């Protein structure tokens, strides 16, 4: 039965793509370079840390750049300027989406534009930032946009059983679609014990089509956040090398690949009483009543003193209502945030391509 489903999906993907090749459907072309960062599987490949990495490379090379994202699961419509290159203009993740806001707070000088219609966002960039190159998030499937350079990320933790179309597996497209990429990065390489069959299959397609590729590793840092003042809300942030001893922690996250977060956080030897895992881009504000009820019940059960989570989750948790923040302050709850960064092995191979797109 799955064979039939796979055949139908593959044919649909190929047919849709062929409409653009035959100019039946038209691609929008822009005068500035567009670097696409995407994947062929659902969630957890590390697109946001990779966008952050590319933005930092552009800064080092003094290449003007802007990040464009659809702001997945944001509640706003139209074009939203999260960061104008000088300051963050919106701090509400419900309006911006969690990942664009996280990038705006980290990058500080990179314009961040979100719009559920990427084409509209690119037209805005054309007017507002005409001399910039675009880092276009999650756009490998955006066939209606002509992209200059296609980077595809492939998670080394993906298993062979995941190489099926959703909902039977994690694929958005067949592995053969990797042939459209200009560059492939195999992410989270240091978390995989060995190259599994899924990576081997993807690598076969990449090598067959002579596509340049690299491996990337991830590293992390951890910081402690506490509430200094409730009205107005003020937070104190303290970088840490390790977790305080004897702290009982509740692990909480809503990301695409929670297992890699759990695996990465083990280096800090956390004393985890329980894990609270939600779907990717979990909306804490919309589910605040349910979330707080779970937190309070687990607090009664375990008496934890801290919450171990990701920066992507934390920007949404600290945006909860004043009532929830007050409760966190009353029990003196500490938040321990694990921040993920990527490191490319032999990164010069990719940097050469980025340089060629600059001025």
Regions found by a protein language model. Name each.
Residues 64-68, 151-152, 248-252:
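Conserved beta-strand elements of the Class I
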Residues 305-312:
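Acidic beta-strand-to-loop metal/phosphate-binding motif
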Residues 1-33, 357-358:
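A transmembrane-helix-recognition feature enriched in membrane-embedded lipid enzymes
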Residues 72-207:
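Phosphate/Mg2+-binding loops and adjacent switch elements
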Residues 17-87:
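Walker A (P-loop) phosphate-binding motif
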